[in-house]
Design a protein with these regions (language model features):
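N-terminal low-structure segments adjacent to metalloprotease catalytic domains
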Residues: 1-54
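Auxiliary, metal-adjacent structural segments of Zn-dependent hydrolase domains
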Residues: 43-106, 119
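Conserved binding/catalytic microenvironments
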Residues: 106, 113, 139
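Short pre-active-site segment immediately N-terminal to the catalytic Zn-binding motif
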Residues: 110-125
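Post-HExxH zinc-binding segment in Zn-dependent metallohydrolases
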Residues: 113, 146-185
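Active-site recognition of the HExxH zinc-binding catalytic motif
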Residues: 124-137, 157
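Inter-helical turn/loop segments and adjacent helix faces that build the functional surface
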Residues: 137-146, 165-171, 231, 235-236
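Pan-zinc metallopeptidase signature
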Residues: 190-252
């Protein structure tokens, strides 16, 4: 399935662009999709100049080449990919992710990029998000838990390190030592690992919001998967239940 040529929607306001996405969602409105995508890093501005520069940098073509390579390597599902300019004004997004991000579902993927992103950076965010797609297809559930979420993120960033390079892992992978993460697991994550993704506590723990350590769940998941990879391959872990992955580590 080809990369969707969202660059051809350049003249439209982001909210108008989201009307084109309605067929890809169940019971969704353009405004609902717009709010969801902007919450995860899409720019709320029209951004004609940004899109023009992205076209000049051949962002869409580069993503397509990288995607085909990755899909073949992992034997992953063929899904549509939508590319939009990212929010360059969000300070935390810029600090933690260099203003690049994405959003993955089992049947589609969104990337939020800017003209300055190099091919390796694009490969990193695509690898991260596409690993989510593969994991969600291998472990389909009606309700995902906090444990599922941290393992999902841990697998994704470990994939970046292994398939793109350690230098392209997100900054949050270096925030805490292994000892600190072990303490976080016992104090914050383990007691609430069964919390559903719809529960307000889920995102507070996953992202480390409020008084919780920044990027808490991501950091714990990264270390868990790092240990599990000493015993199993990445493609094997993608297929294992979250609980089984934890059992392969000292976090049990």
């Amino acid at each position: 399935m080809p990369i969707v040529r969202t660059d051809e929607w350049i003249e439209e306001h982001p909210l108008k662009r989201c009307e084109r996405l309605i067929p890809y969602f169940e019971q969704a409105t353009a405004r609902g999709i717009y709010l969801h995508l902007t919450h995860h890093g899409m720019s709320s501005e029209k951004g004609n100049e940004t899109v023009t520069l992205m076209k000049q940098k051949k962002i869409w073509e580069r993503v397509e080449t990288l995607y085909e390579q990755l899909r073949k390597r992992w034997n992953g599902p063929d899904i549509p990919i939508f590319i939009f300019p990212s929010n360059a004004h969000h300070q935390a997004f810029a600090h933690d992710f260099n203003s690049k991000g994405g959003l993955a579902y089992h049947d589609k993927l969104f990337l939020f990029l800017l003209p300055h992103h190099e091919t390796k950076e694009i490969a990193a965010v695509l690898t991260h998000e596409y690993s989510h797609v593969c994991r969600l297809n291998k472990q389909p559930k009606k309700t995902y838990t906090l444990l599922d979420g941290i393992i999902l993120e841990g697998l994704a960033e470990q994939a970046v390190g292994r398939f793109v390079g350690k230098a392209y892992e997100a900054k949050w992978t270096t925030y805490y030592s292994g000892e600190e993460v072990q303490k976080f697991w016992k104090k914050y994550i383990s007691p609430h690992q069964s919390v559903a993704s719809s529960h307000p506590l889920h995102d507070r723990l996953l992202y480390g919001r409020g008084w919780y350590p920044r990027m808490l769940g991501y950091a714990v998941g990264y270390r868990i998967v790092q240990q599990a990879l000493e015993k199993e391959s990445f493609l094997s872990l993608i297929e294992l239940p979250s609980e089984r992955i934890v059992q392969l580590t000292s976090f049990e």
